Amino acid sequence: MKAIIVFTAALAAAYATWAAQPLLTPAQLQPMLRNPDLRVIDIRDPQSFEMGHIEGAVNAPYGQWLGPAGNIGIVPELAALTRLVQSAGLTPSTHAVVVSSGVDAGDFGATARVYWTLKSLGLTELSILNGGMMDWDSEGEMTDMGPGTPVAPSQFAPRFNPEWLATRDEVKESLRKNSALLVDARPDVFYLGKFRAPMALVAGTLPGAKQLDFNQWFVPGTARFADVEKTRQVATQFQSTQNPQGKPIITFCNTGYWSATDWFAFSEILGRKDVRMYAGSAVDWTQSKEPPPMDNQPSRAESLAYDARQWWNRKFK
């Protein structure tokens, strides 16, 4: 009997250690589904969820984790997030595994943003299914169909921890003091001011920002996050060329989506403690009453020409 108790305790300890891994492969996740403290959070749309999902998964579409229509990157009200995590049956001791479609590297940003939100709400056992449902299906793992099995709501009353959040005022203060490095996770067309998000009022990047395109963290052509060695190589190259002083990092993008991937790489994979995300990102920055000039900001004539092209495309294409 004593041997059985010792073995059981050792198994529980091993699971606790394993559960903390930020990335899980389908093969790693599958045997963990039997654990009652694990909850798969599928953030795809309801139709995709019903066509096939992981056994026991709860559908909490990504749109439910977003802020107001004017800038979806803003962190939602705590009351809304509380209702969401309670309806998913989450508690502080739940091991939550966030799952998306896995169609491309951009899709990973949604899982990273939900992971960031759950961490900020107090969950400590968090993972992302690397490669999403695309890898789950391609490896032949079983799926259930239909709306899923209802779960009992929890009474979890979270508090939002701002440790990993940077606000607009905090970004302005960091610029004034030159105390942090702003890291733009967007591709070239946004960083160089050739294109802007629909809700952004100005194209370009935040003053002094350095670019670290979120795509660099992935196995090319997939939504699969690269291994730790490749992640460390990307981060080391960036640090040596763009952040030799080793300043704290504030990541941003358009609406706190791609920037969640950069945050995840530095904070969760590499273990840096001085990384925050500007959730409102470029849209919030450009919507302020008196935003400082952007870097790579197009001229007024270029902006007017861009607006005209966008209007034409919406009207006639």
Model regions and ranges:
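Positively charged n-region of N-terminal signal peptides that target proteins for export
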Residues: 1-5
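N-terminal signal peptide c-region/cleavage motif recognized by signal peptidases
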Residues: 13-16
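Active-site neighborhoods of enzymes that stabilize oxyanions during catalysis
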Residues: 20, 66-68, 134-207, 290-317
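Positively charged, proline/Ser/Thr-rich regional signature most characteristic
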Residues: 20-22, 26-93, 101, 174-245, ...
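Short active-site oxyanion
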Residues: 34-40, 124-125, 248-249, 273
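Phosphate-coordinating loops and pocket residues in cytosolic domains that bind phosphorylated ligands
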Residues: 51, 138, 287
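Thiolate-centered catalytic microenvironments shared by cysteine-dependent enzyme domains
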Residues: 79-170, 195, 204, 258-275, ...
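C-terminal soluble interaction/assembly domains
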Residues: 235-238, 244-298
